[in-house]
Amino acid sequence: MLILVNNPKAKYDYHLMESYCAGIVLKGSEVKALSLGQGSLKEAYVFVKNNELFLEQFTIPPYSFAGPLNHASDRIKKLLLNKHEIKQIINKKQQQSLSVIPSKVFFRNGKIKVEIWLAKPKKKFDKRETIKKKTIRRELEAEYR
C-alpha cells in the first residue's frame, strides 16, 4: 500500500470512530497528478446526495503534461462503496450526528482508494489534551534516549 496523500489534521480535529475503504472516480490526468504525490485533503469532506457519497474540496493540481485535456482542480469526485456500506454510513451519520472525513488516498492492487472515517469533531479542550499528551510522550522518549 503506497500512500499518495495524507490528511494530517484528521486525528487532531476529530475523534475517529469507524473506517471504510472506498474507490474513487478520477480522470486520467488526476491519476497522473496523484501518482506524483500532488493533492491536498486538508479541507476535504464527504457529503451524501441521492444515496451516493461524494468527496468535495479534495484538490488535485493540474498535471503539467496533460495540456488542454486537463481536469478542474476543484472537481467533485464520486466515491464507490457497496450499497449496504453506503446505507450504514448514512444511518450512522444521521443518528449519531457524525462527520465523514477522508484521511488518506493510497494505491491498492493498482487502484486508487480513499480511506474515509466516521468521526466526531473534537472540542477545543480535547485538542489541548491531544497536544499535552503529545508533548509528554516526546519528553519521555527524549529521556529514554
Swiss-Prot record:
Family assignment from sequence similarity: Belongs to the SmpB family.
Gene Ontology biological-process entries: trans-translation
Cleaved signal peptide residues: none
Protein name in the entry: SsrA-binding protein
Places the protein is found: Cytoplasm
Phenotypic effect of disruption: Essential, it cannot be deleted.
NCBIfam families linked to this entry: PRK05422.1, smpB
Keyword annotations of the record: Cytoplasm, RNA-binding
Top-level taxonomic group: Bacteria
Organism, scientific name: Mycoplasma genitalium (strain ATCC 33530 / DSM 19775 / NCTC 10195 / G37) (Mycoplasmoides genitalium)
